[in-house]
Amino acid sequence: MPRLEGSMVAIVTPMKDGAVDLRALRELTEWQIAEGTDGIVPCGTTGEGATLTAAERAEVIRAVVEVARGRALVVAGAGSNATHEAIEGVKAAKALGADAALVVTPYYNKPTPEGLYRHYTAIWEATRFPVVAYNVPGRTAVDMGPDTVARLAKAGAIVGIKEATASMDRQVQLVERIGKDAIAYLSGDDFTVVPYIACGGHGVISVISNIAPRAMKDLVVAARLGDFARALDLQVRMAELNRVMFVETSPGPVKAAVALLGRAGPELRLPLAPVSEASLSKVREAMTRFGLKLA
């Protein structure tokens, strides 16, 4: 099983004139690796995976895998609210050379705990590929609780969980039920990386790493080494920047920020709309105060 730990980036999908900008994506991936990022996570929430076609997702994953060349893990977004589509997505990630697949809980149709269990076990049985479950109830309208996660872990259906509830009690419950190192525990909230790691987490799948990869890597390293004084200093320093990444629906603000760095365009795919001028101003000001060099 790949070592799912450290600072991973939920990488944006650059777009130009309505199409995926593979050149910019390759350059972003190379920059992330040069800055010390441990894993690249394409086609997730931040990568607008839900509005990419299957062919586009394949293009994105292939490009990231080709650039990474084993220098960073690739955990490819492959979820769907239809189990048969999620299976095909995971099969594609496997065939394209990803190290694991990130599979969000089924959104909109609100499955029961039993439905969630059957969803992930069906994926595992059909693919035999490492799956990181992704629990983000604010996006999906379903919360996969600790009992279901533990049941899946014990069945071998998942190798990790990206937990985006910002609940430390939830993380402690997961460790209590599953064990500290039985699966990978990855934070899905940049705001809570320090306490999450203190509660047994192994790392983060980060939005802010798209614009400040070295800072997030330093924070994760400090926390994992137990230097919580330094880690907290870094977390506090990043707080304003973290907040403005969600001043409007993500990934709008972070794509705007990537554009302000001159690394890719800010284009989003509908129904997401460009951030307002007021929000863009807040993003620019926070980046400047943080010390990022704008293009």
UniProtKB/Swiss-Prot annotation:
Pathway: Amino-acid biosynthesis; L-lysine biosynthesis via DAP pathway; (S)-tetrahydrodipicolinate from L-aspartate: step 3/4
Active site: Y134 (proton donor/acceptor), K162 (schiff-base intermediate with substrate)
Catalytic activity: L-aspartate 4-semialdehyde + pyruvate = (2S,4S)-4-hydroxy-2,3,4,5-tetrahydrodipicolinate + H2O + H(+)
Superkingdom per UniProt: Bacteria
Enzyme class: lyase
Enzyme Commission number, as recorded: 4.3.3.7
Residue numbers marked as site, Part of a proton relay during catalysis: T45, Y108
Keyword Cytoplasm: yes
Record has Lyase as a keyword: yes
Compartment(s): Cytoplasm
Any one Gene Ontology molecular-function term assigned to this protein's record: 4-hydroxy-tetrahydrodipicolinate synthase activity
PROSITE patterns cross-referenced by the UniProt entry: DHDPS_1, DHDPS_2
Role of this protein: Catalyzes the condensation of (S)-aspartate-beta-semialdehyde [(S)-ASA] and pyruvate to 4-hydroxy-tetrahydrodipicolinate (HTPA).
Protein name: 4-hydroxy-tetrahydrodipicolinate synthase
Gene for this chain: dapA
